[in-house]
Amino acid sequence: MSSDESERTVSVKQEDDSLRPKRKKTNRACNHCHKAHMTCDSGRPCKRCIQRGLDKTCEDARRKRKKYLADVPNTALLPNRLQQAETYDGTNASPTESGRSIMYQATTFQHSSTVPISYTNSINDDIYSLGFSKSHNSFLPRNQNQTQPLARSQSTFSQKQSTLPQTHSNLSSSRRTNFLSSAADLEYSTLSSILQDNFMHGNHSTSNEGTPNSITLSPALSPHALTTTVSSNTNTGTATRNMTTPDDLNYTSKRNKPYVAGSSQTPSPQDQLSNGSMEAKARISNASASIYDHQRYPKCDESINQYFLGPTESDQVSMFPDVITAIETMKASDPSVFYERNSKSALSFTIGIVPDDNHYTKNHDSVENESFYKEPEEIYAKVKKPFSYTPGYHSLIAYLRKRFNKPMLVKMAESMAAYRPSFIACTNSLKEGDLIFMEQCFQRTLLTYDNFIRVSGTPTIVWRRTGEIAYVGNEFCILTGWSKEELLGKQRKFIVELLDDKSVLEYFQLFSRIAFGDFLGATMTECTLLTPKTDVKIRTGCMWTLKRDVFGIPMMIVGNFLPIL
């Protein structure tokens, strides 16, 4: 073949390609084209599947599950659901469908203490069976889209209403994520509602479910419960469902002001119903105030079962052992109050932040000022002699002999014998200047840690390698009930005095392993803390961090404790 003929053939092929219509790209291929890596079209079934006889099984290929959809049920991500969501927009959406979704979701959560979650197919079927058709797309005027469907399903709704909350509560109990604050619960429910509305109901607009402006807000997260009133019209045979939102129950709202005799204002039927519901709520709140008397029981946020610890503005201090004792007393003397609070949420505690001029803060700062340096220059100027660890060891041995029997003392001595030779070998070569520098490093490190401990909110205590307590955080005093005067006074206490017998033995065994073992020196364990009340012991999870000086010798142990509830 000559060059002219080859060029002519190439030109003919190019002309054919230019005349051939370009195939449009599709956003999503079908399952068969996706497996074969072939170009697909937007039709279902696509042309390629029709030619191959696979038109009956041609559907959108499943996409990889996104990480942010981890808590969305699988039924919400089926291809047919996604296809409906893609074809569903504001132009073909029915006002009655959006209206029924709002009305019945609010009804379901009216007597529920859980965060709103997505419906499953079974609940959706129950809702649609109340007289609504899934394919019902007829347009109605805005003032009729909530009245006519209810007229057709009023009798059926009364039968189904009692079963929906029970079914929903069973599903929500296994899927709800609990947080220790209503703010976190509300934020989580809002984010979940956005995802679930987009994929389950085909709604691509931002959902406000679970927010203060939404009528589907859970009563557990709202200061007011939702009120639903039904008024019937015998002439037309229609029922109107008036949803009262938390905003509608505001006492400062003009619409809900009570009627004043002699005024020109005439109360409407809606105002009368709203005022009646507010009066009922006022009676309930007054009864609750008499039951949940803070003078009788510790201060508590009853909506999330969270008790307040620490100092208050009235210079009253709520210690953890006192609150635990009060809760046990409540459980024995007033079980109805106890079980009502615990049925709402798991038991939790919070520590308040008080101003610096509080009486409690001033007393604790006065104790710290006597034995704690505030500036680095003060450390280098006043620390002129080494810290003597010998009296501390003698006092520790004397205390252990008074408290423990001989078998336990032998086990403790075995643990001490494991690290004692290493201590002697490391300190023999140190001069007096080195020992002074070692103490300066201790105080300087303690000053640095104080800045973090004050803002951490975690009960923290610091002790030397001998076990002598050197620093105590305010939260640790609130947790155990010990005061800083008792722990940091002239007669210093040892950390073993705050632990029960088993925890003391475990402490020495653990210290012998990390003293010259892992250089990081951090470990997690459990221990039982003793309180000034001999009958109250606190089981805690603790994190012990061993800090070494420049010579590699264990200098201090930082202990963080959290109660196991």
From Swiss-Prot:
Pfam families with a match to the protein in the record: PAS_13, Zn_clus
Basic and acidic residues composition bias: residue spans: 1-20
Keywords: Activator, DNA-binding, Gluconeogenesis, Metal-binding, Nucleus, Transcription, Transcription regulation, Zinc
One GO BP annotation of this record: carbon catabolite activation of transcription
Domain PAS, chain residue ranges per copy: 445-518
Annotated signal peptide: none
Gene Ontology MF: a single term: DNA-binding transcription repressor activity, RNA polymerase II-specific
InterPro entries: ERT1_acuK_gluconeogen_tf, PAS, PAS-like_dom_sf, PAS_13, Zn2-C6_fun-type_DNA-bd_sf, Zn2Cys6_DnaBD
Comp. bias (Polar residues): 262-277
Biased composition (Low complexity): 227-245
UniProt keyword annotation of Repressor present: no
Gene3D superfamilies: Zn(2)-C6 fungal-type DNA-binding domain
GO cellular component: nucleus
Tagged with keyword Zinc: yes
Top-level taxon of the source organism: Eukaryota
Subcellular location: Nucleus
Region described as Disordered: 1-25, 139-175, 227-279
DNA-binding interval(s): 30-58
Functional description taken from the UniProt entry: Transcription factor which regulates nonfermentable carbon utilization. Activator of gluconeogenetic genes.
PANTHER family assigned to the protein according to its UniProt record, in alphabetical order: TRANSCRIPTION ACTIVATOR OF GLUCONEOGENESIS ERT1, ZN(II)2CYS6 TRANSCRIPTION FACTOR (EUROFUNG)-RELATED
Membership in a protein family: Belongs to the ERT1/acuK family.
Name of protein: Transcription activator of gluconeogenesis ERT1
